Amino acid sequence: MSNEFIYGIHAVKAVLEREPERFIEAYVLKGRQDDRLMPILNDLQVCGVSIQQMTRKTLDDKAHGANHQGIIARVKVAKQLNENDIDDILAQHETPLLLVLDGVTDPHNLGACLRNADAAGVAAIIVPKDRSAPMNATVSKVACGAAEVVPLIRVTNLARTMRTLQEQGIWFVGTAGEATHDIYQAKLTGPLAIVMGAEGDGMRRLTRETCDDLIKIPMAGSVSSLNVSVASGICLFEAVRQRLAAK
């Protein structure tokens, strides 16, 4: 079975709490024994995971210079979800909120969107197989544990998946600069999917045409667009605000 590295306290802790069987071995900074790390090391030992102490330089090299917070783990690659898993996930939510990312290829942006999605109670993130950042250590680290919690579904044909979900009552709201009304005028209270495109390019034509509604985020300054992770946070939490107000 293929394996991968994860690094950082949040990412390692999230996998340890939910899928401890994925751990192969762990590497920790030699001599570090603080209150944040020791409980994780104790749990790893209980699970029978081999722990190696390493110098900072060795850990830095393994993490390719990224901020590992003194811990790296080699784990089995998690099961990749696809369109066949969507129905089971939706069945767990009375009024599902989904996030669709069309063409978000930067791992930092994907990780930040996962973190937003977890905070907003998103049921799943849907991405196209051929136009999305891979799930890797960078995504997991930026997501601060959300990558191990929020289902990430990779689909072969995004527009077809959207149409299938529309038939099940999901309303698709896409973000586009050319939209005629803004997010604060849109109704975001029912079963909903918010669709975000890539920075610069936006959504692909077929994705945009498949959306039920197009909205924009009002911009008062000189910049014309926002980072996709910032924009997704704004949209998701406007949906959260409306849903809480409707209760």
Swiss-Prot record:
GO molecular function, one term: rRNA (guanosine-2'-O-)-methyltransferase activity
Main EC class the enzyme belongs to: transferase
Highest taxon listed in the record's lineage: Bacteria
Catalytic activity: guanosine(2251) in 23S rRNA + S-adenosyl-L-methionine = 2'-O-methylguanosine(2251) in 23S rRNA + S-adenosyl-L-homocysteine + H(+)
InterPro entries: 23S_rRNA_MeTrfase_RlmB (IPR024915), Alpha/beta_knot_MTases (IPR029028), Ribosomal_eL30-like_sf (IPR029064), rRNA_MeTrfase_TrmH (IPR004441), SpoU_MeTrfase (IPR001537), SpoU_subst-bd (IPR013123), tRNA_m1G_MTases_N (IPR029026)
Location in the cell: Cytoplasm
EC number per UniProt: 2.1.1.185
Main localization of the protein described in the UniProt heading: cytoplasm
Residues bound to S-adenosyl-L-methionine: G197, I217, L226
Record key words, sorted: Cytoplasm, Methyltransferase, rRNA processing, S-adenosyl-L-methionine, Transferase
GO cellular component terms listed in the entry, alphabetical order: cytosol
Pfam families tied to this protein: SpoU_methylase, SpoU_sub_bind
Family matches, as NCBIfam families: PRK11181.1, rRNA_methyl_3
Function description: Specifically methylates the ribose of guanosine 2251 in 23S rRNA.
Family the UniProt entry places it in: Belongs to the class IV-like SAM-binding methyltransferase superfamily. RNA methyltransferase TrmH family. RlmB subfamily.
Protein name: 23S rRNA (guanosine-2'-O-)-methyltransferase RlmB
Gene symbol of the encoding locus: rlmB
